[in-house]
């Protein structure tokens, strides 16, 4: 059986990353263009456009696509897209740009020239409306809402040419992969059904259990970690990479799973982000996305299984990648092993509730981590990381993390 098709009507990957002489010529031309500075989130989105992770998009969205994505998860041409992919700038710069003008796209943090874009549209948006639709809140305490509210006043829409993947290929060599690379690896392994496990945390026993359930169902699993920016207090990607490698080496059958990484920042959009995670995993060649408790959530903004329910609300043909919906999982002392609400008849006093937030809080505060919470090889790496921190960030517990 072949792998799932890339997303979109054409069913082919559309990487927008230039190479060779064309790249050199376009980079030279871009030196004389007006510069639009990119936020970290926008740079990650541009790189995903470059590697084909956001197939079939050809650039940053114009107004009709923004509106359709925000309100109906649907672009103007009927393509399913659950979160808008947009570029913003100041009104001051926007007023100087003409329709049809080409601009250079520069990462604001590093100053690196990342690409170019033809400005086909300039438009203003109701940011609070976008936040209420996508995040289900306009509270700026929500990190994703804060990102949107801090955007420039004007959105620019148009096709892009991508020049660089930033530091990801060198900084995360062997983990950072393009959709073409993951697809080639799956085919080399003889996999046709592949489940993606989304993670922004080091893997504890519940994560391990979810992946092993998926291995029983599918040919293999892509442990696909986010390599872009997170919120304060989250554990950086290099530490996660080492801890995931330790887990795979000691507790998984060789050849059943692969660790990969992708260049996006977290949006913390909960159910909507779960849909985006499934969409771009389809481009990476994954037939399934593991969706556990509070997928892509933050705080108490979403119910623990809202991300399960949203897949039942979209058109059946919206995505080829399907969710593997897995119930609340935990360690049960009476069962003497990992279990879920579907498999364990015992009460909460017999269960050890596991969460990444709880693990980070215990490690940050120097508390002893209970047996069965995480593997010792993983804890060793995490304890070393926390011991080296000069400044601790308070980790706030929320309802789902406490197992309530």
From Swiss-Prot:
Pfam family for this entry, one: PUA_2
Pathway membership, UniProt: Sulfur metabolism; hydrogen sulfide biosynthesis; sulfite from sulfate: step 1/3
GO terms, molecular function: ATP binding; sulfate adenylyltransferase (ATP) activity
Catalytic activity, EC: 2.7.7.4
Biological process (GO), any one: sulfate assimilation
Catalytic activity: sulfate + ATP + H(+) = adenosine 5'-phosphosulfate + diphosphate
Gene3D superfamilies: HUPs, Sulfate adenylyltransferase
Keyword tags: ATP-binding, Nucleotide-binding, Nucleotidyltransferase, Transferase
Bridged cysteine pairs (disulfide): none
Similarity comment: Belongs to the sulfate adenylyltransferase family.
HAMAP family: Sulf_adenylyltr (MF_00066)
Name the UniProt record assigns to this protein: Sulfate adenylyltransferase
Gene (name only): sat
